[in-house]
Every structure is written in structure tokens, then in C-alpha cells.
Amino acid sequence: MAALIAFLTRMWTLFTRYNTFFAEGIKNTLIIAFFSVLLGTVFGTLMAMLRMSKVKPLRYLATAYIDFIRGTPLMVQLMFIFYGLPMTGIKLPDISWIPNFSRFAAGIVAMSMNSCAYVAEIIRSGIQAVDHGQTEAARSLGFRQSQTMTMVVLPQAVKNILPALGNEFVTVIKESSIVSVIGIADLMFRSKDVIAVTYISLETLAIAAILYFIMLSLIHISEPTRLRR
């Protein structure tokens, strides 16, 4: 018991002394996760439409992209974006008044590309879960295909899609810790900074784990409210 109390005391001391480190890490983690899911949702929706397209080349292209992204490690994708693109002559954007913008851009692009593949399957599954009879009924009433999709299918599919998108956001937050390898000051990166200064690793990692848990718990708690709306 005494050892546990001492451990918790060291954790609290570390947290109060280096709370600005952890706060910056949380901020950057949420920024990366938010934009990754936002862009992933936008392009994932487009990819889902291509995946269900009647035009075979587009459908095959979307299927190949989704299978490739889901079948390769996120680390490889991140390294290719950050290190590989500049080697091919494609420079990442950089803004002088935003520190490390190119690193953030690489992290968000890689995370968005990865999320896009999973979101595409979430949306496709949500749409296909709607009974096909709904589509046939709408078409028999004279609805165009676009009207059928926007006015009949999507409103019903959203109920299937939103919970899965919430889970995707949770997954992106957890996977975003990988961007620390390219120098983005997310929560994991800042935790490593604290370890480098204090040489106290276990307590610091425990703090990081608790902070991740709190962030994800808040998202889970907010989901029922969002779905009711």
C-alpha cells in the first residue's frame, strides 16, 4: 500500500510540475484527430460513392485504394508521406509563422488517408444496411437516383453510420500517438520529453494513459447525446 501511495504521489507531482507539457500534447493530439477524421469523412464519403459506383474502373480503383490502405501499416504510410514525398520532389507545405507546420501536415495527411479507407467502408456498410425495398419504393414514386439517396437512403443510413464514426474518432485518437515519431508534439511526444527531463518513465506513461482514457471516455459519454439530436 505504501508503495502504491508513493507511486501515485510521484504521478501527481509530475503532473502538477509538467502540466503545460501534457496540456500542449492533448491540444495537438485533438487537433490532429479532429482534422484527420474531418478530412477522412469527406474523402471517405467520396470513396464510398466510388466503391458503389456502376462504373467498373472507378469501383476497382476505390476498392484497390481501400484494400491497400487497410492492408499496410500506418507507420509505413506516415513514413512515406513525411520522408518519401520530399525524396520524389514533392515538398510538404510549410508556413513560417506556424512552428512545424510541415510535420503537422504530413501527420494529418497520413492519418486522413488511413481514416478515409475505414470511413468509406463504414459509410458503404451503413448505406447497404438500408433495406433495398426503400430504394425501389422511392424509384417507383418517380424519385431520381440522387433524390432517392439524399431523401430516403441517407437519412436512414446516418443512424448506422454515426456510432461507427464515433468509434473511428476514438481509434484515430489512439493511433495518433504514432505521429510522435516524426517530431509532432502530441501527448506521447510530450510525455517522452518529461521522461527525458526527469528520468521517470513508468509514472509519466501512466499519466499519459490516464489522459488518453479521459479523452476517449468523454467522447463515449457524448455519443448518446449526439445521436439523440
Role assignments for model-derived ranges:
Residues M1-S222, R226:
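Transmembrane alpha-helices and adjacent helix-loop boundaries
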Residues R229:
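Conserved protein kinase catalytic core
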